[in-house]
Amino acid sequence: MTDRDHASHAPVRLALVGATGLIGRRCIAISSESDAARIVGIARREMELPAGSRCEMFVAQTDKWGEVLEAVQPPTLICTLGTTWKKAGRDEEAFRAVDQRLVVEVAQAAHDANVPNLVLISAAGANAASKTFYARVKGEVEREVSNIGFKRLDILRPGLLKGPRNNDRRIAERLGIVFAPLIEPLLPAKYAGLHSIDADLVAQAALGLALRRAAGKFVHDNDAMKRAAREWRNRVEPAQGD
């Protein structure tokens, strides 16, 4: 069966945590445009869905998310959980509570619920040995999740995300997006992974990778995500002449 044949069948139900964030919302919106996949969102509170969304939403406390996953039995969990330094009150422990402990806990709960595959949204520069707090936390999360034992683990490391947020754009981030087109061409090739990337491309990549079944651990930089996003579009867009 080809990927296009697969897309013509019933949508694959993919679980998602982090639906209120930029990537999570784009995953819901983009998946709703085709019949390749359907998002089953799990959140702590009700949320307003993007216009035209076709998805299921479960509202439950985080300690019950594993039970939801066990009931849904998706082939893949997409984890886009994350907070900001500002929302965390510029407190390291508060930041770790969401970006590290909650991420690892839900990943473990998914594995315990027999969800075989995980797509994790991390960040460019993630490194457990980094002197930078943010990069170090992301690297530690990647290391912990890698040890859980998923059949397939996809780790996405996007650079600065471009896309509409819900009134939560930090000043430095806004400036970065404005000046990125001018600065990025001047950066050495080794910093290409830090370049900005459209949130839609990351969401498309996450959806496409969530449908893959080959076992293993795979880390995706901006270029790899763009390729995966292209594969998703090829999967869902009608063939020329259809």
What label would you give each PLM region?
Residues 34, 128-236:
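Oxidoreductase cofactor-interface core, primarily capturing Rossmann-like NAD(P)-dependent enzymes
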Residues 26, 30, 109, 144:
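Rossmann-fold NAD(P)-dependent oxidoreductase module
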Residues 1-9:
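A short, basic/flexible loop-to-alpha-helix module at the beginning of a structural domain
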Residues 17, 42, 80-81, 118-124, ...:
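SDR active-site strand-loop-helix element
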Residues 9-34:
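N-terminal Rossmann NAD(P)H-binding glycine-rich loop of SDR-like oxidoreductase domains
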Residues 22, 89-140, 147, 151-154:
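Conserved Rossmann-fold NAD(P)-dependent oxidoreductase catalytic core, especially the SDR/UDP-sugar
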Residues 42-46, 61:
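N-terminal Rossmann-fold cofactor-binding loop
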Residues 14, 55-105, 109-112:
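NAD(P)H-binding glycine-rich loop region in Rossmannoid oxidoreductase-like domains
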